C-alpha cells in the first residue's frame, strides 16, 4: 500500500511537469524489531532497529535506480538537503553532505547512533563489520556482524578483541557530551510507570 501511495505522488508530479526539479527523500527515524531478539520497541541498537531506509530521487541530479550499501546517518540529511538547494551549510550543523556517497567517490568508514532512554545514555559506532556499544555505566558490547548477524555473542569479553574495542571506544566517545537531565524529567516518570 505504501509503495502505491508514493507512486501516486510521483505520478502527480509527472502530470504537473514537476518531477524533474523535485527532490524526493524517503527516510525513517528507526527500524522495527518485530519481536526479533524478543524486543518490540525502538530503544535498542540491534540492526533491525538502526538500519533504516534512505531513498533520494531526482532525475538528472542523481543516478537512476542506483543502490548503495554505504553507511550513512540521518544527521547527514540536513547538510545534504542544503547543498541540493545551493544553501550554505552553517558551521554549527553536524553531519556531512552525502553527494560524494551518491556517486561512490566517498564512503564513510563509521556511523554513529545514540539515545537517551530512562536517563541511561548509550552510544554506538559501527563499521562494515563490527558494532561497538557503550553505555554511561561503562558497559561495552562488540559484535561481529559478518559472523554473528543476530548480535548474540558479545566479543567484549574476549581479550583478543581489546585493540578493536579500544579503537572503537575512542571513536564512540570522541566529542560525546552526555547531557545532564534532571531526575524529575517528566518522561522519566512516565517510563518508570511502565
Task: Please describe what each predicted stretch is.
Residues 41, 61-72, 85-89, 152-161:
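Active-site rim elements
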Residues 33, 45, 54, 67, ...:
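Conserved beta-strand positions that form and line the central face of beta-propeller blades
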Residues 30-36, 75-78, 83-145, 150, ...:
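C-terminal cap/loop subdomain of S1 sulfatases and analogous C-terminal strand-loop tails that border
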Residues 11-63, 73:
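Histidine-centered active-site microenvironments of extracellular/periplasmic hydrolases
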Residues 53, 57, 170-180:
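A short, conserved beta-to-alpha structural element at the edge of catalytic cores
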Residues 1-3:
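Outer-membrane beta-barrel transmembrane strands
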Residues 5-12, 80:
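Short, conserved SAM-binding segment of the class I
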Amino acid at each position: 500500500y505504501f509503495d502505491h501511495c508514493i507512486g501516486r505522488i510521483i505520478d502527480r508530479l509527472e502530470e504537473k511537469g514537476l518531477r524533474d526539479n523535485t527532490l524526493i527523500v524517503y527516510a525513517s527515524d528507526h527500524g522495527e524489531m518485530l519481536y526479533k531478539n524478543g524486543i518490540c520497541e525502538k530503544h535498542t541498537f540491534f540492526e533491525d532497529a538502526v538500519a533504516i531506509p534512505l531513498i533520494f530521487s531526482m532525475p538528472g541530479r542523481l543516478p537512476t535506480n542506483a543502490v548503495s550499501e554505504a553507511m550513512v546517518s540521518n544527521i547527514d540529511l540536513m547538510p545534504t538537503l542544503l547543498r541540493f538547494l545551493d544553501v550554505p551549510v552553517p558551521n554549527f550543523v553536524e553531519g556531512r553532505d552525502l553527494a560524494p556517497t551518491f556517486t561512490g567517490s566517498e564512503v564513510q568508514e563509521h556511523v554513529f547512533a545514540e539515545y537517551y532512554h530512562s536517563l541511561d545514555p548509550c552510544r554506538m559506532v559501527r563499521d562494515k563489520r563490527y558494532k561497538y556499544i557503550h553505555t554511561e555505566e561503562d558497559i561495552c558490547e562488540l559484535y561481529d556482524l559478518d559472523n554473528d548477524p543476530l548480535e548474540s555473542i558479545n566479543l567484549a569479553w574476549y581479550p583478543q578483541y581489546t585493540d578493536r574495542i579500544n579503537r572503537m571506544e575512542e571513536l564512540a566517545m570522541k566529542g560525546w557530551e552526555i547531557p545532564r537531565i534532571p531526575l524529575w524529567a517528566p518522561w522519566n516518570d512516565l517510563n518508570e510507570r511502565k
